A protein has these predicted regions:
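Sequence/structural signature of beta-propeller domains
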Residues: 2-21, 25-356
């Protein structure tokens, strides 16, 4: 990723916070490695699970050694069981199609017709099987006067190919900012972005239709109570899932003014960066960065018409912290110990930063 020569203090804080989150995630995973008895969480009906498993919508590992910073995830509706992903930065104009049944890459697309990507953070699929990619990251917290969105048709045949994409220039009505979450409404095709702020950000709505002439101004329409690393709309456009490093929030879409419903039981991962609904909407698939990164499936609210993997908070904007607790059932005790260790580590890191 290209960066200015003189980073600002706020930018350094943002990078330090991200490093702290990764450290905490590592400590949490280590602590949770110990076995713990836990009652079974909600399980979708067997018929729904069987169908989902047949499509590959279950846990898998991304095996491709070229994918070391999987920062976005999108389920293909045209190719069941296939998930599109990309690296965070310093990789080039590439998208990867991963078969969730095997973890193998079955296609790599090289995008043409665009500039050099800076910090690609998100991917989504809209109506007509149009892939939309968000080159919207800004680790220097508002350095770039504009960011980019790329749009391309999803190939009907999965193989390595060069695909021409359309590039859109994007600005924000209230100034430049960092963002890692992009979503496309599955019915209208309208593009939305959620900015990434530690104390919570906003949902930004783009124009009804993006334009290649001039800049597309995204406007804030609703607050999001999360330090968001990714978000996804359900295939029917009725639900919004937003995740952070250690938790997430389940919203009703509510015609573009999201209404908080519950906390999401987000799995603990090395560096939780991505989320997408499975093509049939019964699963939420959570991805992580790193070599051989894992993608973990959880039942989505309303899976097969029953149940939820969310913890209701009555629509509250608080609950167990802005990121949620990411725990459930018998894992709470072990998670509490892990969280204490992680908090101690984060406290130490913050003290070191203050002394500097």
């Amino acid at each position: 990723m290209r960066r200015p020569s003189a980073p600002r203090a706020s930018a350094l804080r943002a990078l330090a916070h991200r490093a702290s989150a990764v450290l905490a995630g590592t400590l949490l995973l280590a602590a949770l490695a110990a076995p713990a008895a836990a009652p079974a969480a909600y399980a979708a009906p067997a018929t729904a699970y069987a169908a989902s498993a047949a499509a590959g919508d279950e846990n898998f590992t991304i095996k491709d050694p070229r994918i070391t910073e999987s920062s976005g995830l999108a389920a293909s509706r045209q190719h069941p069981g296939i998930y599109w992903t990309h690296n965070d930065s310093d990789d080039g104009p590439y998208l990867y199609a991963v078969d969730s049944r095997t973890g193998d890459t079955v296609a790599r697309l090289t995008l043409t017709g665009i500039g050099t990507p800076r910090d690609v953070e998100a991917i989504s699929i809209g109506p007509g099987n149009r892939i939309v990619v968000g080159d919207i990251g800004d680790n220097l917290d508002g350095t770039w006067p504009y960011v980019w969105i790329y749009e391309l048709p999803e190939p009907r045949e999965l193989k390595d190919a060069t695909v021409k994409a359309t590039q859109y220039e994007v600005t924000y009505a209230d100034g430049a900012r960092d963002a890692e979450s992009l979503l496309v409404h599955p019915k209208t095709g309208r593009v939305y972005i959620i900015d990434k702020k530690e104390d919570g950000g906003h949902l930004y709505a783009g124009p009804e239709k993006l334009s290649v002439s001039g800049r597309n101004v995204f406007k804030p329409v609703a607050p999001i109570d999360l330090w968001a690393t990714d978000a996804a709309l359900s295939p029917d456009g009725q639900r919004l899932a937003v995740r952070g490093y250690f938790g997430g929030i389940d919203y009703d879409w509510n015609n573009g003014v999201p209404k908080r419903v519950a906390r999401l039981n987000v799995p603990l991962q090395r560096q939780g960066e991505s989320v997408t609904y499975s093509a049939d909407g019964t699963k939420l698939m959570y991805g992580s960065e790193g070599e051989s990164s894992d993608v973990q499936a959880r039942d989505a609210r309303g899976a097969a018409g029953k149940g939820s993997n969310s913890s209701s908070d009555g629509g509250s904007s608080t609950g167990a912290g802005k990121d949620g607790d990411g725990t459930s059932g018998g894992t709470v005790k072990v998670g509490a110990v892990a969280l204490a260790v992680a908090c101690a580590a984060l406290f130490g890191v913050s003290r070191v930063r203050r002394r500097r």
